[in-house]
């Protein structure tokens, strides 16, 4: 994947403002609320019975932070995202059996959450760069499935 200097700057500039715990928790919770079938692999998280329960669930928040921390690894390694996510792709495919479509769904929710938190900074150009990034990350995570 080729990244322009502008894309790299837009991605890293916004990422410097991101509260990983908050954005990660809200993104994972949002995916569980908007796409409830994605909850099936998270029964150990306890109560996911309603949007209120999901959004207040400490395990959802903690895992969301973990997921977004890994997303930050992609940003630090924009020119080597496939290798950055090789082990995570293997884990999600071989051990966890996650539907690779879920990576795209989480990416969609992440974009919505970023737009909600960073409105004026989440310009159309920034949105386009982050859309490209979530697509590349989803593809890298799904790589083991192919």
From Swiss-Prot:
GO terms for biological process: hydrogen peroxide catabolic process. Keywords: Heme, Iron, Metal-binding, Oxygen transport, Transport. InterPro entries: Globin, Globin-like_sf, Globin/Proto, Hemoglobin_b, Hemoglobin_oxygen_transport. Residues 2-146 form the Globin domain. GO terms for cellular component: blood microparticle; haptoglobin-hemoglobin complex; hemoglobin complex. It comes from the Eukaryota. Gene3D superfamilies: Globins (1.10.490.10). Heme b binds at residues 63, 92. Red blood cells. GO terms for molecular function: haptoglobin binding; heme binding; metal ion binding; organic acid binding; oxygen binding; oxygen carrier activity; peroxidase activity. Belongs to the globin family. Involved in oxygen transport from the lung to the various peripheral tissues. Heterotetramer of two alpha chains and two beta chains. This is Hemoglobin subunit beta-2. It comes from Amblyrhynchus cristatus (Galapagos marine iguana). The lineage of its organism: Eukaryota, Metazoa, Chordata, Craniata, Vertebrata.
């Amino acid at each position: 994947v080729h990244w322009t200097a502008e894309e790299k700057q837009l991605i890293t500039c916004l990422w410097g403002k991101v509260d990983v715990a908050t954005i990660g928790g809200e993104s994972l919770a949002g995916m569980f609320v908007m796409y409830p079938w994605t909850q099936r692999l998270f029964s150990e998280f306890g109560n996911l019975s309603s949007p209120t329960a999901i959004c207040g669930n400490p395990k959802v928040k903690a895992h969301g932070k973990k997921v977004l921390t890994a997303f930050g690894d992609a940003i630090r390694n924009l020119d080597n995202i496939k290798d950055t996510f090789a082990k995570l792709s293997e884990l999600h495919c071989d051990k966890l059996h996650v539907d690779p479509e879920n990576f795209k769904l989480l990416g969609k929710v992440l974009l919505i959450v970023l737009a909600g938190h960073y409105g004026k900074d989440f310009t159309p150009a920034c949105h386009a760069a982050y859309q490209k990034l979530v697509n590349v990350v989803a593809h890298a995570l799904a790589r083991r499935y192919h």
